[in-house]
Amino acid sequence: DWLKTVYSETSSSKLNKHYKNWANLYDIDMSSWGYAYPLQLNKILTNKLRLKKTIKILDAGCGTGYVAEVLNKLNYKNITGIDFSEEMLTIARSKKIYKKLMCQSLNEKIELRSKQFELIICTGVLTSGHVGPSALHELVRILKPQGFFICSIAESVYKKNGFEKEIKNLKNLVSIKSISKAFVALPNNKNSAKSRMYILEKLN
């Protein structure tokens, strides 16, 4: 099971290799496992946040662009994607839904200027073996004041891996607008964890 493999991996170079080998089947697997994040994002953007279609969006940890297809269907067109896997980005590029794609790790300083995105989405990324809580500060840095950061965080790592603490540390920069009820991210995969969707708003 690819899911078990990637979430138990501790080496970033091996993780990159796993995604290289998984890239061509990723969308098929996500679809068959009932990937919940696209639906969750659709609900947030349709019911909770009524944002202009022209806003500048960052899809952080975009992978193949599977979740960003929701943005495209909702007529958001100004989307930048970042991912550390060139193979996943090749799939994303073929969908022609991104204005710009960048290959880099979110665990490092992001090569983008501060305060430029009105919306950042980050789903299925802030979890074990992938991107740690230290990335939150960098993502908030490139978010515009009054901009929104929508992310999913697995229940199993929220406290244990320091995400709760890091969000508290950012209290002078962001406020928590809402936290969803816990849901199973991949209902048709026995190795899937429960997650919640967090909406943070940048203060200044």
Task: Describe each PLM feature range.
Residues 58-109:
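Class I SAM-dependent methyltransferase SAM/SAH-binding core
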Residues 146-154:
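Conserved beta-strand signature within the Rossmann-like core of class I S-adenosyl-L-methionine
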Residues 187-204:
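Core SAM-dependent methyltransferase catalytic element
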Residues 27-43:
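Conserved SAM-binding loop and adjacent beta-strand
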Residues 162-182:
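Conserved Class I S-adenosyl-L-methionine
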Residues 110-120:
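A short acidic, Gly/Pro-enriched loop at the edge of an enzyme's catalytic core
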Residues 134-145:
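A short glycine-rich, Lys/Arg-flanked "PGG" loop and its adjoining helix->strand segment in the class I
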Residues 1-24:
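N-terminal, positively charged/glycine-rich alpha-helical extensions of SAM-dependent methyltransferases
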